[in-house]
Amino acid sequence: MNTDSHNLSEPYNIGGQKYINMKKKEDLGVCQPGLTQKAFTVEDKFDYKAIIEKMEVYGLCVVKNFIETSRCDEILKEIEPHFYRYESWQGSPFPKETTVATRSVLHSSTVLKDVVCDRMFCDISKHFLNEENYFAAGKVINKCTSDIQLNSGIVYKVGAGASDQGYHREDIVHHTTHQACERFQYGTETMVGLGVAFTDMNKENGSTRMIVGSHLWGPHDSCGNFDKRMEFHVNVAKGDAVLFLGSLYHAASANRTSQDRVAGYFFMTKSYLKPEENLHLGTDLRVFKGLPLEALQLLGLGISEPFCGHIDYKSPGHLISSSLFENDIEKGYYGETIRVNYGSTQ
């Protein structure tokens, strides 16, 4: 039974492959001709007013000199032994030339101290994500505040020859859907991202490209066919960063150089996006041994498609019983893939 579905329309089948019709995104929105990266860049990382305004309008803000280059060198040294990839990654979710270092905060104290705990990053994330609500309980009204928490912190090494990654919204892990709007509306975001360049990042070496203004797009606005004047490759120096909303379409680009491009991407989310009870921390793993797959999944030890709750892109249940979760990676992270047909009707 499907209790909450936001399908665009009913797909149709041709030769065993499902398709859906969509139109090219023609409207430039906020990305008017002549727009340059300077329009959504700040020189002062503590100019909160400017950062917030640019994120509201464009969905992102480039922050110059976010972290000292010497700290980038320290992070690269700490993270280097932890890069990996799986052979099944042949373009999805990453090109075969890309390696990742997941759970970076556990491998690098510098990442935790100087990136994730950075005051500006936390303050901006709280601005967009914090919630304060009032709940009736008996004869009183209780006010409760939900803060932020780290959703993910992964360092990506885009190697020479890597191809373009497909555009996506980061907040798909929480099945967040958005309706088209003319201007930013608070209360719809579940993530704020921070991309930090640990090496120089430009169009040639695989910089992140972003569709400016796409945080305002709805389900019928296609990230696969749009006016390319809305596309920007984030051109930044080592130590610079880019803040962006979880609803902004973004992707890694092809690396046409002979050098690796290394950057870390860190996402804050709402702190209530988790179970009420924490059953894992402080629990001996032997408690879970011998439990059937269904029980382990009900206890939160399986991935929610596409990636939510993973440990190194595997279900946490791998630590309990690798045999029960043996097809976790090979089967892919998506329940179904539907191809898009542009500009035609069934």
From Swiss-Prot:
State the superkingdom: Eukaryota
GO cellular component annotations, sorted alphabetically? cytoplasm
Q: Which residues form a coiled coil?
A: none
**GO MF annotation, one:** phytanoyl-CoA dioxygenase activity
Tell me the Pfam families matching this sequence. Answer: PhyH
Q: What is the similarity comment for this entry?
A: Belongs to the PhyH family.
What else the UniProt entry mentions is: Present with 1600 molecules/cell in log phase SD medium.
Q: What name does this protein carry?
A: Uncharacterized protein YJR154W
Organism annotation: Saccharomyces cerevisiae (strain ATCC 204508 / S288c)
